[in-house]
Design a protein with these regions (language model features):
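Alpha-helical structural signal in soluble globular domains
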Residues: 105, 128-132, 158
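Short amphipathic helical patch at the helix-1/turn junction of helix-turn-helix
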Residues: 85, 119-120
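Conserved GNAT acetyl-CoA-binding A-motif
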Residues: 106-117, 128
Length: 170
């Protein structure tokens, strides 16, 4: 049996921290949302995501929800509606782990494309998505509320039909 490098062992172990979101998680999810965003989603939006059957996931660190991801699957397309990591846990690879999970789950569900919108000002998220082989498709003008009015969203997409995906290590 081949020995895995310590960094890979740690990454594989951390995947176990991802599980499906339940309604019991919504209080913690809202706490993460409010800590991370100036214009957070409401509790009702998260309830609706669970109710309509979107693919909703949380990442736990020592039994506390510190991140989550929500994907709408529709035929051959997966749309990441929200991917958020609590500010105290950002820049630790949790966002990448969740993105990997959402991508793999979308592929396994039959999607051949995964897309998302990101605030033009969210440089850290843009770097994550571009490093994960997402490509810019366009701009949604005035998509997000902003303290000065509205902010544009960059539309990013990634093909899931390739045999080799460096983000997933395959």
């Amino acid at each position: 049996m081949a020995a895995y490098p310590d960094s890979l062992k740690a990454q594989l172990a951390r995947r176990d921290n991802i599980r499906e979101m339940t309604s019991d998680d919504l209080g913690s999810v809202i706490d993460v949302e409010i800590a991370a965003y100036e214009h957070p989603w409401t509790l009702g939006i998260f309830r609706d995501c669970l109710r309509v059957g979107y693919s909703c996931w949380v990442y736990e660190d020592e039994s506390s929800v510190v991140a989550y991801g929500i994907v709408m699957l529709s035929g051959a397309e997966a749309h990441v509606l929200n991917l958020c990591v609590h500010p105290d846990f950002q820049r630790r690879g949790i966002g990448r782990l969740l993105l990997n999970h959402l991508t793999q789950m979308s592929r396994e569900s039959g999607a051949d494309t995964i897309l998302l919108e990101v605030r033009q000002s969210n440089i850290i998220a843009m770097q994550l998505y571009l490093s994960a082989d997402f490509h810019e498709l366009g701009v949604r003008t005035g998509y997000y509320p902003d303290h000065e009015g509205r902010e544009d969203a960059i539309i990013l997409a990634k093909s899931l039909i390739t045999d080799h995906d460096p983000m997933l290590g395959i």
